[in-house]
Amino acid sequence: MLAAMAGQAYARDVVDMMGRKVTIPDDLKKVYAPSPYGAYMMYAIAPDLMSGLMFVPKDTDKKYLPKNLTDLPVIGGVGAGPNANPEMLLKTGTQLLIVWRAEPNPITEQTTALLDKTGIPYVFVSATTLEEYPAAIRYLGTLLHRENRAEKMAQMAEKILADTAAAVAKVPDAQKPKVYYAEGVDGLSTECNDSIHVQLFKLTGDVDVHRCHTSSHMGMEKISLEQVMMYKPDVIVAQESMFVQKVYTDPAWQDVKAVKDHRVYLIPRVPLNWFDRPPSFMRFLGLEWLTNKLYPNQYAVDIAKETQRFYSTFLGIDLSDADVREIVAQ
């Protein structure tokens, strides 16, 4: 997709993932991604090129992120989070914007108008599903001159997709567990099975018990405890630690099969959520984690070692065994 601009050492023409031809500086030193999708991918591929952050990382997350990130200024975003500060973009010397395109969010005229107003060249990178991520990773690797690093990530991602798919394929549909996705501190918000927020359920056998058409991109569909009980989930995967801490002692939940069987699992979320909100490259590790939880015999990997390997490859962080225990609390 990328082609150097002949005769000009200071600039090159590239074609972004929406087919737009863009002229960008060849010697990139300051790059900014004004959305969580792109910002998180920059954490992985080229944290040294980042000119700023969308928001300040939580203190609990900082030790698991590239060290230079914590000193960067907060610039804001386009379409998510606080609006980007044009003056800060200029002050930081930002040379290129990485704009992530993910379904079902279209790139609107308002968005492009905001981007054009900055006067900074921008490229669109497109990936929604995990299957689309390796191509986006390789694209960014070429764009940012990080080909070797990006290739290692893309190959790891592809291997995870292939290995987990092979494990899931060994299990007959009738033997696949029914899974309820508990969101919110009460556990009574969830996602329809067609939501982008539950792609990991699709990849592990389409196991989401809440079969419906999602009412909005934001999701968080409200549900009653009675409905959860009717679903008879074998497993509950939860976002909130407060819910997991109380579910085994809350009388109202004691008749739910997953609770009876002690199969309620808290999704790891340090430094980025492994599952959702926002969906990021961390979902590859989340896919391994979930496949191992649902099919421990078919996907009998050592999640602690996989976690160390993944954080090393994608975040450049070497985790101790104690770090892994802290991250993978369940």
Feature annotation, model-predicted:
Residues 11-14, 21, 110-189, 218, ...:
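Extracytoplasmic substrate-binding proteins
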Residues 32-34, 51-54, 96-100, 122-125, ...:
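Structural recognition of the beta-strand scaffold that forms the well-ordered cores
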Residues 38-92, 96-105, 206-209:
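A short, structured surface patch at a secondary-structure boundary
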Residues 5-11:
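Sec/Tat signal peptide C-region and signal peptidase I cleavage site
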Residues 79, 193-219:
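Alpha-helical, coiled-coil/dimerization segments enriched in small aliphatic residues
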Residues 103-117, 239-254:
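A ligand-binding cleft/hinge motif common to bilobed small-molecule-binding domains
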Residues 17-19, 75-87, 214-225:
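Short helix-initiation/N-cap motifs at beta->coil->alpha
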Residues 22-24, 39-44, 59-63, 99, ...:
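Short, solvent-exposed loop/turn elements at domain surfaces
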